[in-house]
């Protein structure tokens, strides 16, 4: 059984890039295109890690992280959350961390950095050399 990652992202190009990168390492990726669907997917599927865009079309990533941290689903409040966002102004990282994210990454997405951040929480089921 592989490691399950939920990526909550409304941009299809970013979704495809991350999906290809993570699936090449053996991760199983679940997709959600908005915050409400992301919260629902996290509460339904067995998730090991969440990648979270901040600028979503319905509720923002800060609210998603807050809802996940207060979820009553067993263990969900402790699932690692990596914020991946174009928000790169002073204070954005702190806001993401204070909302419940464990790590903050700014876009554009650097695949090697993504692999390193993900693997710090959940080892790759199919590791490859960079």
Tell where the protein language model's regions lie, with residue ranges.
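Conserved acidic carboxylate
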Residues: 9
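Short hydrophobic/Thr-rich beta-strand motif most characteristic of the beta2 strand and flanking loop
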Residues: 26-33, 41
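The feature encodes the CheY-like receiver
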Residues: 57, 89, 108
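C-terminal output helix
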Residues: 109-118
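Active-site residues of response regulator receiver
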Residues: 53, 85
């Amino acid at each position: 059984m592989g490691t399950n990652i939920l990526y909550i992202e409304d941009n299809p190009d970013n979704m495809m890039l991350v999906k290809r990168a993570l699936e090449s390492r053996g991760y199983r990726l679940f997709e959600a295109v908005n915050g409400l669907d992301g919260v629902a997917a996290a509460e339904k599927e067995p998730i090991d890690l969440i990648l979270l865009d901040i600028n979503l079309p319905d509720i923002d990533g800060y609210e998603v992280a807050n809802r996940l941290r207060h979820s009553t689903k067993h263990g969900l409040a402790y699932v690692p959350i990596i914020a991946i966002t174009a928000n790169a102004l002073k204070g954005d990282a702190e806001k993401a961390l204070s909302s419940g994210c464990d790590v903050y990454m700014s876009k554009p997405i650097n695949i090697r950095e993504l692999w390193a951040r993900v693997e710090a929480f959940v080892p790759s089921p199919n590791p490859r050399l960079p």
